[in-house]
Amino acid sequence: MPSFPQPGSVTICEINRDLITADNLSDDRAKETYAKLLGMVFSPVPFQSDEVVSRSPDEPEIEQQGRGNGEAEALSLVSALRGILNNYFKSIFHPNHVNLLPEVGLQGVSWHQHKHIVAFISGANQVIVRDYEDSECKDPCILTSDSQRDVKVLDWRPNGGKSLSVGCKGGICIWAASYPGNAASVRSGAASFLGTLSRGSGTRWTLVDFLRSPDGEQISALSWSPDGRYLASASYESSSFTIWDVAQGLGTPIRRGLGGISMLKWSPTGDYFFAAKFDGTFYLWETNTWTSEPWSSTSGFVTGATWDTDGRMMLLAFSGSLTLGSIHFASKPPSLDAHLVPVDLLEIVSLTGSQGIEKIAWDASGERLAVSYKGGDDIYNGLIAIYDVRRAQLISVSLIGFIRGPGDNPKPVAFAFHDKFKQGPLLSVCWSTGFCCTYPLIFRSHILP
């Protein structure tokens, strides 16, 4: 039988397909269970929930210092006309996409590729970074800047030291860790407002670059190439995505189709690139010549997408379906020959009474899948389902149990796995009740006593 956390309890971890719970949120139960096996405790990180953080206005700031009044007025008029035209075309091609954003599994929490450092969106304009390797500092670091408004997505840079990209209104903030005697350097030629320092003790974080999006668009999708050289970004307001050469600060726009973009995912090997749109289409690209193959869905638009670690298989969730889809590549890169196979999550319907899949995350080992879902019966509402995954020619899943968050009526806002945690899958969840909790999923024989 799948493990079910009783109402009022909180989940602590998995031990060999058994999801352990406690009566309240504290480190004591963690020390009694997984800490003996892992040698560390991942304490929950409290944060102020989004609803109580005031949002900044949407109007872009126009720099006019050093210009004459006539030139400044002309620039204002041109800018206003451009804004009117942009808004007109966006209302035609991307009418309600901003209202659909909450249905998409935006990356609101991200683990550093090689460190025990987690970052997550903690408010409309701020990000929290918690370094579990820093034993001297128990407090998280808060990243804020006047340039960082209306944060939607974040992603750690692979092979880039401690460097974090944050998608927000008007562009992408690039943060880097600074140390005494070794301060992070701002990109040559970048804007003068850069160099903002983070708040909090311990490691200081510096805003080293701001990559401006076309027409001040809201960045709502980010994905790094595995080597950390290129960063892909997109907006629900636009049908094109941009590939940034981050070292140069230069972006190249690429467009296919008309719909606004909901999601971008670079494959772990870098050979393929996935782009999904709100009109129900999605594109598979091979990155050798940047050739694409269009796909369309009859089950709504893609709300979740995750690659397997080999980059030869992908799981998709759709807005109008209780069934996942798995993409299997039939040949080696750069071939785009692939087929889509359904993956049934039978228990989601029979046990929870859910109305649809919300978000998904697949750990790098390929053995654990986390799924959140819409609605559900009272006792199942707001839980995360954890599945055991088996990969052969086709993907098969079996339900292990459910994770319940802390507080009253908790709901998962965002979640992600640590891709390189050696002792097993490590799932972090940001809950609507204002806690980011981390759950070790331990089942390997060489760890268990």
Can you say where each PLM-predicted feature lies in the sequence?
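WD40-repeat beta-propeller superdomains and closely related acidic/aromatic-rich repeat-like regions
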Residues: 1-449
